[in-house]
């Protein structure tokens, strides 16, 4: 899930105030290249100095070598370090998982990318014969984004009233469509979380099973992502995890680690770890999830314009400062910011989570962490 308060979605020195922790190799023989790890650690420490985050955890992969890095703490009281492979809410990185699921159904002949959405969900959307599945996956359908509406505040104090509310996909879409389409379908790009709620409904309409069930059977289980889940209403994060916060107008921090994920649905509800995200990225680029022709469809992009990069089918493609092309996604949900990117050859991968103190994070510092993993 992405909101305007988080800025564009993609997507500190070790001794500073005792906030940062040394890199933690996954195995002694698998330490990542020192220069890259040091560059990433420095940018993570810089993120901590912005004062908007309680902690950061990252997993940097270069070839068959991995390094886990941490900075800050699991809670704002500073008593516990960020878990080395703690669980976290991944926000809109969920969109990559749901898009992969749809593309698998395309490969099975059960969905056509250029079919009108009305073929599968008749009566749900206006212009149902003009809006295609591809447009929805690519945010070019013109569907209004519900997270920009007053009915769905997803940042800081206003969000507290909705924190434990149980939403339905149908209710979210119905409310979003009280606004007209933002533009003529297929003519522009505009990020729409509502569109990805529709994607979840599409998966259920075609398979007879919830998007959570299909993602679990098609992606999570085959890849052995034992610490990844797609909750429906459960408010808990299982296993060790850092805590996320929002900041009230009076300066008080509220722990929002426990929340009802239904507000994010198939566009942002999933939970994972950096280890599992790394495995997922590897599965994506090595053909374990999609046939080459379908992965190629996923990478057909349109310009995002509001930020560097282009958008495919649930996938961001962008160039780093040193010219390396990477693919992946950023994600935000109250309390957490996530990023997961890989080079196309899979040689370098980054999975990273920030447990926030407030929703207004320093996005320049966040972007620097991504860039430093690929351009030391």
Task: Report each predicted region and the residues it spans.
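Solvent-exposed coil/turn segments that connect beta secondary-structure elements
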Residues: 63, 74, 141-142, 357
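N-terminal, post-signal-peptide region of Sec/Tat-exported proteins
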Residues: 62-82
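Primarily hydrophobic membrane-targeting regions of prokaryotic envelope proteins
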Residues: 44-47, 54, 58-62, 68, ...
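Short, surface-exposed loop or secondary-structure junction motifs
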Residues: 68, 128-326, 330
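Catalytic loop of the DD-peptidase/beta-lactamase superfamily, centered on the K-T-G motif
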Residues: 2-6, 28-69, 255-376
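Secretory targeting and sorting signals
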Residues: 1-31
């Amino acid at each position: 899930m992405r909101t305007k308060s988080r800025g564009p979605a993609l997507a500190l020195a070790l001794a500073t105030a005792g906030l940062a922790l040394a890199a933690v190799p996954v195995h002694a023989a698998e330490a990542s290249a020192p220069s890259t790890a040091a560059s990433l650690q420095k940018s993570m420490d810089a993120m901590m100095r912005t004062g908007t985050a309680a902690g950061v955890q990252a997993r940097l992969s270069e070839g068959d070598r991995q390094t886990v890095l941490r900075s800050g703490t699991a809670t704002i009281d500073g008593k516990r370090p960020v878990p080395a492979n703690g669980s976290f809410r991944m926000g809109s990185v969920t969109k990559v998982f749901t898009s992969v699921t749809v593309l698998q159904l395309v490969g099975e002949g059960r969905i056509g990318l250029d079919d009108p959405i009305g073929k599968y969900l008749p009566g749900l959307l206006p212009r149902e014969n003009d809006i295609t599945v591809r447009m929805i996956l690519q945010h070019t359908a013109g569907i209004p984004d519900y997270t920009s509406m007053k009915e769905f505040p997803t940042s800081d104090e206003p969000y507290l009233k909705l924190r434990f509310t149980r939403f339905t996909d149908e209710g979210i879409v119905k409310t979003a469509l009280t606004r007209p389409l933002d533009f003529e379908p297929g003519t522009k790009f505009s990020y729409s979380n509502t569109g990805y709620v529709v994607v979840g409904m599409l998966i259920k309409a075609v398979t007879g099973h919830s998007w959570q069930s299909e993602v679990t059977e098609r992606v999570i289980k085959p890849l052995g992502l034992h610490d990844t889940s797609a909750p429906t209403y459960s408010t808990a994060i299982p296993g060790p995890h850092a805590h996320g916060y929002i900041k009230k107008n009076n300066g008080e921090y509220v722990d929002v680690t426990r929340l009802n994920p239904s507000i994010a649905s198939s566009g942002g509800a999933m939970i994972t770890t950096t280890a599992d995200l790394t495995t997922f990225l590897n599965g994506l680029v090595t053909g374990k999830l999609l046939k080459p022709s379908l992965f190629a469809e996923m990478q057909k992009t349109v310009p995002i314009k509001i930020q560097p990069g282009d958008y495919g089918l649930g996938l961001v493609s962008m160039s780093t400062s040193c010219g390396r092309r990477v693919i992946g996604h950023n994600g935000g949900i109250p309390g957490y910011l996530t990023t997961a990117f890989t080079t196309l050859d899979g040689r370098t991968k980054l999975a990273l989570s920030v447990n926030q103190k407030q929703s207004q994070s320093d996005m320049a510092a966040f972007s620097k962490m991504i860039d430093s993993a690929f351009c030391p």
